[in-house]
Amino acid sequence: MASNVRTRFAPSPTGYLHIGGARTALFSWAFARRHGGTFILRIEDTDVARSTPAAVQAILDGMSWLGLDADEGPFYQMQRMDRYKAVIREMLAAGSAYHCYASTEELDRMREEQRARGEKPRYDGRWRPEPGKVLPAMPAGVEPVVRFRNPVEGVVAWDDLVKGRIEIANAELDDLVIARADGTPTYNFCVVVDDCDMGITHVIRGDDHVNNTPRQINILRALGAEVPLYAHLSMILGDDGTKLSKRHGAVSVMQYFDDGYLPEAVINYLARLGWSHGDDEIFTREQFVTWFDLDHITPSAAQFNTEKLNWLNAHYIKHSDDARLAADVASRLARRGVDPEAGPRLESVVALYKERVANLNELADAAELYCVAVHPSDELLAQHLTDAGRAALASLKARLADVAWEKPGLNQAIKDTMAEHSLKMPQVAIPLRVATLGVAQTPAIDAVLEVLGRERVLMRIGRYI
């Protein structure tokens, strides 16, 4: 293990922070925390056409919501252009890079001819300087790209901390463009310079980057830099076994916030996507950091299971502090245009419902019934507020006017009404639920009445008698 572990999360702001990226960030963050190291956030925004400020903010918001705090950064590649160009000049001077004047049309013809011969399309090195080689005359009016002079012999090999030994023959790699004709450096080159300058010791990222790794290793070696250790995480599949995508539901991290998930539930679930600690399924962030290592990451694809995430979320809601849940519900109600102070104390409401919901939106749905005038459906009214039901409510209202407003007294008032009208509990409780909350199913009715309060209960019953 390196004496000072330094990891990084380096998203491109061409879209929002998705679940796969969040897992990569989590594993990189946890590995640094586990070893007392440094976690760096780097925004790879060199794709100017596709990068947006909104996407950058979404990444920062997602990281903040998940509690993945960076020790350094965020660093932005667009602010490091002078550094990249300086390194390119050094490589040109050292002979590890060269100018290529081949036009786009010329390269297209080259690839077509290679395909026609049954060969893999690749740059043929026509502008690569070699001893005794005569290069073509520089064409007028053509701005050259800069290519990395990749080794032509041997293999690039690394012991991937997830996938094991990987070897790629240098003969399979052509000379990568590291600077475009307009002088802007390319992705693979910027990544290498950043990892080198920032002293990254462990690169933990998705396995869609495996093919970039041999090129990056060769550039690092050409710069005389130490090569970091690599750990490539397998992709995440949807419930149906295909690659996770929007059609599987929420894939943006902040969509999970909007959908009512707690960050600790998402963290707990992400931690189990491709990593395990025995049979432990529920654990705190602190436990995860203590237990996390790269040895227990599976090289096979992880499968996203929405039901398991929902189960975890319900668990964390059930065990969350009422005041915290009430604050979240209050903000959700406010975003709906509902005054969260128009009803009883939200702490009392969430305490009633938090063991009955799967997400915070369901909790807000329940709380809303306590804050607004409810309007039962015609079907509920016809089914439950019959003449007998209304008569029972009238008797109950009279009893509730002066009963001690606590569950024992409320329960007794309901029982006395049942006895007076020769009714069973559902024949009184369900009409009462419909009249007070507009629904037929709620927690225990005496608890509902206690939380709703005498004034609201009497007013709501009074509408139906």
UniProtKB/Swiss-Prot annotation:
One of its GO terms (biological process) is glutamyl-tRNA aminoacylation. A motif ('KMSKS' region) lies at residues 243-247. ATP binds at residue 246. A motif ('HIGH' region) lies at residues 11-21. Keywords: Aminoacyl-tRNA synthetase, ATP-binding, Cytoplasm, Ligase, Nucleotide-binding, Protein biosynthesis. One of its GO terms (cellular component) is cytosol. It catalyses: tRNA(Glu) + L-glutamate + ATP = L-glutamyl-tRNA(Glu) + AMP + diphosphate. Its EC number is 6.1.1.17. It is found in: Cytoplasm. GO terms for molecular function: ATP binding; glutamate-tRNA ligase activity; tRNA binding; zinc ion binding. The keyword Aminoacyl-tRNA synthetase applies. PROSITE patterns: AA_TRNA_LIGASE_I. PANTHER family: GLUTAMATE--TRNA LIGASE, GLUTAMATE--TRNA LIGASE, MITOCHONDRIAL-RELATED. Belongs to the class-I aminoacyl-tRNA synthetase family. Glutamate--tRNA ligase type 1 subfamily. Catalyzes the attachment of glutamate to tRNA(Glu) in a two-step reaction: glutamate is first activated by ATP to form Glu-AMP and then transferred to the acceptor end of tRNA(Glu). This is Glutamate--tRNA ligase. It comes from Aromatoleum aromaticum (strain DSM 19018 / LMG 30748 / EbN1).
